[in-house]
Amino acid sequence: MIRIADGRKEENWSSINIIIDIFRSTTTIPVILSRGARYIVPFKDVTSALNFKRKNKNVVLIGEKYGIKPPFFDYDNSPAQIINADLEGKIIAFTSTNGMYVLSRIKRGRILFSSLVNMSATIKKVKGKDDILVVPSNRPIGKAVEDNIFAEMLKLALEGKNYDREILVNRIRETKENTVVSISTQDLEICLKLDLLDCVPEYIEGKIVNDP
């Protein structure tokens, strides 16, 4: 069975949980790993990420709080900033307002990260599996329309049902005007690139890693 449930409210987790945060963390995360990072250590808050950096000087800090890059961070939660960054062999400390909060709530099962940029890779990885939960991250003040549109796309694809990808991607593009936090044109274009990457990040034993 494939379900969709709000990551901020759900308590009934599945064998496979797929976190969705289109604008921007589940787009940025696969981009980070595609740039050669060893792994990502996720944090629910900025202070914890900074403390980790103090103990591990070579760590690269990436993330945002309410859409703004925190002081002392190396990069924003921005796929456009990361897409050409040299992260080869680096350990990343990452935090975001929505996606990492939802990650902290999931208590069982495998945890994957998906967006438009790795949609086909995600489908290939989990197609045919039972007990899948697609988890829109949404926002503290309510639903994120773009996350829920993509969640429906992913569910339909996994169920083998027909849908118009172009129409749905355009609907996601249109939601940009209604997002709480402004998104740069450069970030938006990367967030909307279907199948840009082949990797499906997975959270394993405190780290987000590329296809284990």
From Swiss-Prot:
It catalyses: (2R)-O-phospho-3-sulfolactate + H2O = (2R)-3-sulfolactate + phosphate. Its cofactor is Mg(2+). Keywords: Hydrolase, Magnesium. SUPFAM superfamilies: ComB-like (SSF142823). GO terms for molecular function: 2-phosphosulfolactate phosphatase activity; magnesium ion binding; sulfopyruvate decarboxylase activity. It is an enzyme of class 3 (hydrolase). The keyword DNA repair does not apply. Its EC number is 3.1.3.71. The keyword Hydrolase applies. NCBIfam families: PRK00886.1-6 (NF002057). HAMAP family: ComB. Belongs to the ComB family. PANTHER family: 2-PHOSPHOSULFOLACTATE PHOSPHATASE-RELATED. This is Probable 2-phosphosulfolactate phosphatase.
